[in-house]
Amino acid sequence: MEKVREIVREGIRVGNEDPRRIIHAFKVGLALVLVSSFYYYQPFGPFTDYFGINAMWAVMTVVVVFEFSVGATLGKGLNRGVATLVAGGLGIGAHQLARLSGATVEPILLVMLVFVQAALSTFVRFFPWVKTKFDYGILIFILTFALISLSGFRDEEIMDLAESRLSTVVIGGVSCILISIFVCPVWAGQDLHSLLASNFDTLSHFLQDFGDEYFEAREKGDYKVVEKRKKNLERYKSVLDSKSDEEALANYAEWEPPHGQFRFRHPWKQYVAVGALLRQCAYRIDALNSYINSDFQIPVDIKKKLETPLRRMSSESGNSMKEMSISLKQMIKSSSSDIHVSNSQAACKSLSTLLKSGILNDVEPLQMISLMTTVSMLIDIVNLTEKISESVHELASAARFKNKMRPTVLYEKSDSGSIGRAMPIDSHEDHHVVTVLHDVDNDRSNNVDDSRGGSSQDSCHHVAIKIVDDNSNHEKHEDGEIHVHTLSNGHLQ
């Protein structure tokens, strides 16, 4: 009885983990009932009489073809259908060729043909691109060719056999595909997209919490806050094992028709490339995490000497990851992550200046080694974050993400004086110029002497706006820092 309870608890856990699994189970049952109805109801009697025992291939096709996602089902269904068609045609050709060779040579030739096609097809399965997308089709090709050829040796109705075999496979495959697409579809492309965005979010949590965990004493802070932070720091490990899932989902997604915001020939391979860079970052984070949990701990007062730049490097890299996650989830082009990447690189330069000042001259060699290893890892993560940002921009361009930007503002002179009002400008460029027009009359009255060498247009000031997204304006100033001015109701704050 305890074993039954355990199975029930496991079933509840699996269902709660992803409710779509329960729906998928019902979809498979529905497909089997639909195909089986050809045998149990009288109106379909001619169907059973025509196909005979081969009609069972329709049921077998449903069992082996129906997969969790639309892409996987389409891939298997098309593989099975095309392989059955090609193998059936070649099997008929092999049968006819063997018959022309005479009764004595016929069985020998058939055996040789089956051996050659099985050997060659099995060898082709080792090709990487075949293994990835067509492995199941090759297996069905080997099976169907052998069945058609050997059955044809003993059965003169070879054409009927091939036709009924192909027809039943098509019936089963089409049933699976239609139910998979039109009944609560599960799109592999959407799952891949969500997985990649989730991985960005996971790594951002580690980098944002790294400073608090590394520079604060372990016993410091509220217990619940500390425990939550530790859980966030451990979440990155899921990214390390995501390669197989990403590659499988990308493979299935290539079979899927356009759906939602995913157009035809969506750049699924670019998702795999971005995922590979994320795993590289996760491996460096794994090494960085080992120093947090190391038995050999550097005194906090020594860490404090480099706290400001290191905190900024990790937090800005984490913020950049967070922005890229939001960009992917909303499928919009946003350069907000570039701002954080630039700030993290500026923090790297500040760290370099700080190290050159000799601030660590009094640190013990062993402590110096551990501290410098942490610094090196963070610098590597900052550089890798820049590569990831570039890769995401390539993905956004290839996938035609929406250029969702807030209206750029143009300040014009108003009737009340020098205070301007916001005017929207239609533009799709990434860089804009805002012209701020002051009250020329007031300027002249206050600066009579300055008006000799210039015209009224000299009082206009141009501010180069680098980014305008849905939450903020980003402005590049002469001090090298990038400042953010939020927008509210179309006005600058």
Swiss-Prot record:
Outcome recorded upon mutating residue 36 to A: In strain: cv. Bay-0, cv. Landsberg erecta
Induction description: Up-regulated by aluminum. Small induction by erbium (Er) and low pH stress, but no induction by cadmium, copper, lanthanum or sodium.
MF terms (GO), sorted A to Z: malate transmembrane transporter activity
Residue intervals passing through the bilayer: 28-48, 51-71, 104-124, 133-153, 169-189
Main subcellular localisation: membrane
Post-translational note: Phosphorylated. A reversible phosphorylation is required for activation.
Source organism of this protein record: Arabidopsis thaliana (Mouse-ear cress)
Effect of residue 194 to F: In strain: cv. Bay-0
Subcellular location: Cell membrane
Tissue expr: Expressed in roots, but not in shoots. Detected in the root apex in absence of aluminum stress and in root apices, the stele and endodermis of the elongating zone of primary and lateral roots after aluminum stress. Not expressed in cortical and epidermal cells.
Signal sequence, renumbered to the chain: none
InterPro entries linked: ALMT
Keyword field contains Transport: yes
Protein task: Malate transporter critical for aluminum tolerance. The STOP1 transcription factor is required for ALMT1 expression.
Note: Essential factor for aluminum (Al) tolerance but does not represent the major Al tolerance QTL also found on chromosome 1. Acts in parallel but independently of MATE, an aluminum-activated root citrate transporter.
Region (Disordered): 441-460
Chain positions found as Phosphothreonine: 385
Effect of residue 375 to I: In strain: cv. Cvi-0
Record keywords: Cell membrane, Ion channel, Ion transport, Membrane, Phosphoprotein, Transmembrane, Transmembrane helix, Transport
Modified residues (Phosphoserine): 320, 327
Protein name per UniProt: Aluminum-activated malate transporter 1
One GO cellular component, as annotated: plasma membrane
GO BP annotations, alphabetical order: malate transmembrane transport; monoatomic ion transmembrane transport; response to aluminum ion
